[in-house]
């Protein structure tokens, strides 16, 4: 990327930030293109595909939210995060890059839930192996600062993370990070991940039903003993599935704390309608706890998070 293009993207983010400060909605993708054009960003010159503009907008919102004070009360936090997420237009374009890399970002209200389930302490090291535009990690920056490890293989999204000034940034295939010396030196206490559902870099366009489990296993191998991994994955990844069975056979010391589906409409704004689930996994824990809920919804989210805090002690 040239310095000129980087400067234009910077001014684009400044303009976006003004919208966020005023809580002004960007109503359509056409409006987003007009805003980019106002900053002299030209298609085919400064960006190749529209989704890059959306990625910048998403990264700008993530960075903005990372500097806000999220309400402590669970329902207030969810409403607060959802109100800002609605400022971006609904994303429906399925670009070749997004399909290949399975780049479907985590909605920030769900990201916040994943973080709560992780029970993160102030001295924990936290890894996000497929960080995208920083939807999850951005909500941790105020409290953890340089103890966040982000990895993103896509070059443009990796650049967006660099622009957000993370201290520990890598650009590697998340399905192989356990094999890399620089990652084996890391022993994260907590891992929060939203891996590709059905493709890996190796298989490219071909569907790989073990894609999610390969990413999961690679990250799990790095996890500290007694550590906790929070997984957002497609709903078909469940006990008895090929993917989970593969992980179970290769990670016999794991303990499944929670296994619950979430509302499929949650991902609507991010360009996919897949039904998803959240798994909370611990590595060889001293005390095995269990959160029995099979579904997460608006009615029980407070109960689940309170139970999680109580069990954590």
Regions found by a protein language model. Name each.
Residues 114, 208-268, 274-280:
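Conserved Class I SAM-dependent methyltransferase catalytic core
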Residues 111-142, 150-154, 172-206, 218-223, ...:
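Conserved proline-anchored active-site loop of SAM-dependent methyltransferases
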Residues 141-143, 163-166, 184-185, 205-208, ...:
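Short, glycine/charged-enriched secondary-structure capping and boundary segments
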Residues 268-313:
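Flexible, glycine-/basic-rich loop-and-beta segments that form/coincide
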Residues 2-165:
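Class I S-adenosyl-L-methionine
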Residues 104-109, 206-213:
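Conserved phosphate-coordination/catalytic loops
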Residues 147, 167-170, 255-258:
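Conserved beta-strand segments of alpha/beta enzyme cores
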Residues 164, 181, 186, 254, ...:
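Structured loop/turn residues at beta-strand edges in well-structured enzyme cores
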